[in-house]
């Protein structure tokens, strides 16, 4: 009991001390700390990346060559010293994972310490598509493949719609930039359904994004990759054709595609 009273007394003293501290001690200014003033400013630009391994910069060397980091480093949204950046993406994430886990974190309220992004980039769906590829490789009955693929991509469309709806409601001032899926010729050569499957997927992305008349924008990564060489790791000698992540060059192309749409819709 005495120990509990001591702890309570310490908490009261701490609260009084913190409450009495001058504002300059609670939030250092650039002149006092030597730290760039822009990131301490109330109006600092806030950029959040959501998605899967591609948004995470997986297998980029170094990882900061991933498209998300390139957007930050090239000051696509604002100068670096006036930009707060949060990469919430996770390798392996499906559209369901983004909807259930990343979106709620993106919507944490400012009063609770939330990020309150002004710009959001989203790259998700590759792992949804890989589930179809796995099904094709393991299911002996080809007549079930198209229904399964249709089901997966249709559910992806529902998830994407819910992701964008929740972001629009929870962050009404934020602008959201959504990538579609680039072609993977090495897989398409081995799995004839892969090309039509990606085309259907991109149609769904286009339709869902089109349902939001403001602050949601399509980034046509598919078009940006067309005709390019060595943009995907599976194209490189000695690498499995089923390696679907971009090369550093591919990430650069993605960053350029995003930057063009962002610049046009600031």
Regions found by a protein language model. Give the residues of each.
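Serine-esterase "nucleophile elbow" of acetyl-processing enzymes
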Residues: 27-89
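Oxyanion-hole/transition-state-stabilizing segment in secreted/luminal serine hydrolases
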Residues: 97-154, 183-184
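Bacterial N-terminal signal peptides that target proteins for export
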Residues: 2-10
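A structural motif corresponding to the C-terminal end of an alpha-helix
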Residues: 78-79, 162-175, 204-219
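Bacterial N-terminal signal peptides
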Residues: 11-19
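Structural recognition of the beta-strand scaffold that forms the well-ordered cores
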Residues: 46-51, 55-56, 84-89, 118-123, ...
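Short amphipathic alpha-helices and their capping/turn segments at secondary-structure boundaries
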Residues: 33-43, 99-117, 162-173
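Catalytic His-Asp segment of secreted/periplasmic serine-dependent ester chemistry enzymes
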Residues: 181-266
């Amino acid at each position: 009991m005495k120990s509990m009273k001591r702890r309570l007394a310490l908490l009261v003293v701490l609260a009084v001390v913190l409450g009495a501290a001058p504002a300059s001690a609670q939030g250092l200014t650039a002149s006092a700390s030597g730290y760039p003033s822009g990131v301490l400013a109330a109006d600092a630009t806030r950029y959040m990346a959501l998605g899967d391994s591609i948004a995470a910069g997986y297998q980029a060397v170094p990882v900061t060559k991933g498209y998300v980091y390139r957007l930050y480093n090239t000051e696509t949204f604002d100068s670096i010293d006036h930009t707060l950046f949060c990469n919430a993406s996770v390798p392996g994430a499906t559209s369901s994972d983004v909807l259930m886990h990343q979106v709620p974190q993106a919507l944490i309220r400012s009063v609770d310490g939330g990020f309150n992004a002004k710009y959001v980039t989203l790259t998700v769906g590759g792992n949804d598509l890989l589930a179809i590829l796995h099904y094709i490789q393991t299911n002996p009955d080809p007549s079930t493949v198209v229904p399964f693929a249709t089901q997966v991509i249709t559910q992806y469309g529902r998830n994407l719609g819910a992701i964008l709806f929740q972001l629009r409601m929870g962050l009404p001032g934020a602008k959201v930039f959504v990538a579609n899926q680039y072609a993977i010729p090495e897989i398409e050569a081995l799995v004839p359904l892969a090309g039509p499957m990606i085309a259907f997927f991109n149609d769904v992305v286009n339709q869902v994004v089109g349902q939001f008349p403001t602050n949601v924008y399509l980034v046509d990564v598919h078009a940006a990759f067309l005709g390019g060489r060595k943009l995907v790791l599976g194209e490189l000698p000695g690498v499995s054709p089923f390696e679907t992540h971009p090369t550093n060059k591919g990430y650069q192309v993605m960053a350029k595609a995003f930057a063009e749409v962002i610049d046009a819709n600031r």
